[in-house]
Regions:
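Chalcogenol-based redox active-site neighborhoods
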Residues: 2-178
Length: 178
């Protein structure tokens, strides 16, 4: 097992790019068919929502670096639009932005059909989802990824977006719900 100076196993790091430059993540996304790893995030009102709280509903998890980037903001707007037509489905938009910033963005943009969650204090994302960027200018933020979970808590779709500045494949993610 190779390790870097911060003791992350570099044998299992995923590779993506940011503006064409290679960066790595702290691991790999869990596989389709696996139980979705538990995590919790902070809402704009500072209450905590845990993934297991949503068992019985389908869940789309939109992970992204920061709402302060055009692509991330666009992904939240798009999932908000799509979520309005989804039955028994919750869409979580997850980043390390502070909950106050997420709340301000959602209010300003009229985002009402998704739940913004901040994982600014959740270290478990690193080990359970492997999507924290390990190097480069966005080190410490989340890579762009989408995970879709069925009503039993199993992953039915996952995508780690190869280029962080690209939007996720909305069509494929939403098709997993059909």
């Amino acid at each position: 097992m190779k390790t870097s100076s911060n003791l992350i196993n570099t044998d299992i790091m995923a590779k993506v790019t940011f503006a064409g430059s290679a960066v790595t993540t702290t691991g790999e996304l869990p596989a389709v068919g696996a139980l979705a790893p538990k995590f919790g995030g902070v809402r704009g009102d500072l209450s905590v929502l845990h993934l297991p709280d949503l068992l019985g509903k389908r869940v789309v998890i939109n992970f992204f670096p920061s709402l302060d980037t055009p692509v991330c903001a666009a992904s939240v707007r798009r999932f908000n639009k799509e979520a309005a037509a989804l039955d028994n489905t919750v869409v979580l938009c997850v980043s390390k932005d502070l909950p106050f910033a997420q709340s301000r963005f959602c209010t300003t943009e009229g985002i009402e059909n998704v739940i913004a969650l901040s994982v600014f204090r959740c270290k478990c994302i690193d080990e359970k989802y492997g999507i924290t960027i390990a190097d480069g200018p966005l080190r410490g933020l989340l890579a762009r990824a989408v995970v879709v979970v069925d009503t039993d808590g199993r992953i039915i779709y996952e995508q780690l977006v190869d280029e962080i500045t690209n939007e996720p494949d909305y069509v494929a993610a939403l098709a997993a719900l059909k």
